[in-house]
Amino acid sequence: MRRSLSVLSLAATLAALALIVASAGAAPGRGPKPCRHKCPPPPPATDCGTKTGPPSTYAHVIWIWMENHSYSQIIGSSAAPYINSLAQGCGLATNYTAVTHPSLPNYIAATSGNTWGITDDNPPSSHPLAVNSIFQQAGSAGSYEESMPSNCALSNSGTYAVRHNPETYYTNIRTACNADNVPMGTTSGGAFVTALSSGSLPKFSFVTPNLCNDMHDCSIQTGDSWLQSWVPKITASPSYQAGNTVLFITWDENDGSSGNRVPTIVVSPYTSRGTQSAAAFTHYSLLRTTEQLLGITTFLGSAATAASMRSAFGL
């Protein structure tokens, strides 16, 4: 009898403990505990493929340029869950290559259609360019540069790298650069988030993370987190929700391995979720596509013969 009572007492104790645990899990405001080791990736992005019938021209095109990673280092990587959610939930160019090495000539090629013989990363004083560029073509353009100390800064400062700010190299638009090439700010305040929330974006926006957040000096995870903090700000903006904004995310060059293949992601309300294109695209394709989206009919340099990305991504 005593043994039976002990068994009953133990069962009652275990039942009471189970009730306590269940109650704690169901308490108001108590969510699941954060994962301690490998967290599951975020669900695929849902801000693409929400509209049909793309416009003939768009009001805004935004570029975000990351740094120095190959396609295989990013796509499928557990270190980049947010980027891969965008690749799965929006559009992905699977055969997109940079133009050359190192960084600077890629930035110049993408914005003017030519490298102009540049083969280094020297500052604007070494490469003054009085040539046409997308900044001039667009009619209104803005560069949002993270960690830049002042407008249109022409030299490196801390984690700001002038070689990643192509507008500073075009001497024929220096006045515009001084006005519209600005420190980016943060997600809680500053030039870019204000332009997004107020609907005052220029037609063309060039967005440059600092040397840590662009993956140049810091980890893939750091860049992935940075994009996760900023891209939802873009897709929640009035201009994106209205269906007149397209975002391109690309990398300037790969890690130096052969082929120079880099990830490029297309985010737009008209791009069906999970769209992939294996067409051969380059930074010149990005320039041509941007010109088309903004209604520009004269293509700069090699953009004139580059493949357009427009139809591949439903733009």
Where are these regions (language model features)?
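Hydrophobic alpha-helical segments, principally membrane-spanning helices and signal/leader peptides
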Residues: 1, 7-8, 52, 237
